Design a protein with these regions (language model features):
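Bacterial N-terminal signal peptides that target proteins for export
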Residues: 1-8
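N-terminal signal peptide c-region/cleavage motif recognized by signal peptidases
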Residues: 16-18
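Low-complexity, acidic/polar, glycine-enriched regions of mature
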Residues: 20-142
Length: 142
């Protein structure tokens, strides 16, 4: 009987370890997550801007060193700090938000150092054009 209890306890511990090593899914919190970008303005300054509406999911499996990221950005929510620049960037010369109200990113690979993600390869679709990009992970806390 004690061997059965030991086997049951061992199975429970293995199951607990397997559960803790399972992939972890994160929903992007749109009140605290902003896609940011910067651009050079006439060679005089670098403007830091953001999109105020971002949704998506992030999944990481640290044990398997895999993951996935899917993000949708509402391009009409661009925020440069200037209403005039916002309208200009939303226009047909740049984002053309009337025709393309969203941009998307879908990962193809996640690179890890130890148990932390450091880079995410994927495809960015902007104005109906998809191109490969690599996003650098600068901070990850679990």
């Amino acid at each position: 009987m004690s061997r059965l209890r030991l086997a049951t306890a061992a199975a429970a511990l293995l199951a607990a370890n397997a559960a803790s090593a399972a992939p972890v899914s994160y929903g992007i919190d749109p009140t605290h997550t902003f896609a940011r970008f910067s651009y050079n303005h006439l060679g005089l300054s670098t403007q830091l801007s953001r999109f105020d509406k971002t949704t998506g999911t992030v999944v990481f499996d640290k044990a398997a060193k895999t993951g996935s990221v899917e993000v949708t950005i509402d391009t009409t929510s661009v925020n440069t700090g200037s209403t005039v620049f916002n309208e200009h960037i939303q226009g047909p010369d740049f984002l053309d938000t009337a025709k393309f109200p969203t941009a998307t990113f879908k990962s193809t690979a996640v690179k890890f150092e130890g148990d932390k993600p450091v880079a995410i390869d994927g495809n960015l679709t902007l104005k109906g054009v998809t191109k490969p990009v690599t996003l650098k992970v600068t901070n990850f806390t679990n």
